[in-house]
């Protein structure tokens, strides 16, 4: 697996199947997005790419932990620091410059609440509008649910905060572990 922490150094000539988001904790909802890009990549001989925005210290998982978890599952993991340049980039520019010109996206899988670009102006409606123009297939994946509540990193953090590791593991879909001194 290629592990990229500097987006300017990533290059591919291959068509890609991309999923984008924070991917904090790599919970069951994230796992479904990843399975969708894997399926497309296998069927269409494309490169599978997880594009994760690095949100800093508040994250459940570091980039290195994501790398260890995804090793052997996807072709490329991009950890994109949430810099001012990324934060200020207009949504249309993100689609054109990042998804199309740099990633060569042929397929994009995102959750129903995915937003991107300056002031979160980009959303699934915008991705749908641009799909035909740029020739990518878009799949919107419904949120995973547990006990009638959407699985999210916030839900996992809440469970861990009150010591409910068992619930956190059900939401994650794997055993939770932490390292420290």
Where do the language-model regions lie?
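Nucleotidyltransferase catalytic core that binds NTPs
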Residues: 1-181
């Amino acid at each position: 697996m290629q592990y990229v922490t500097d987006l300017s150094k990533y290059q591919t000539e291959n068509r890609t199947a991309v999923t984008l988001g924070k991917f904090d904790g790599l919970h069951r909802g994230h796992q479904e997005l990843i399975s969708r890009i894997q399926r497309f990549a296998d069927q269409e001989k494309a490169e599978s790419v997880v594009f994760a925005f690095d949100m800093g210290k508040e994250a459940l998982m570091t980039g290195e932990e994501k790398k260890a978890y995804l090793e052997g599952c996807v072709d490329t993991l991009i950890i994109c620091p949430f810099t001012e340049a990324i934060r200020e980039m207009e949504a249309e520019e993100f689609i054109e410059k990042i998804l199309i010109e740099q990633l060569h996206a042929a397929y994009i899988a995102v959750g129903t609440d995915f937003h991107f670009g300056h002031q979160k102006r980009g959303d699934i409606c915008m991705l749908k509008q641009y799909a035909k123009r740029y020739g990518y297939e878009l799949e919107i994946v419904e949120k995973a649910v547990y006990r009638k509540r959407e699985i999210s990193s916030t839900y996992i953090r809440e469970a861990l905060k009150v010591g409910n590791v068992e619930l956190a593991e059900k939401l994650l879909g794997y055993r939770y572990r932490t390292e420290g001194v």
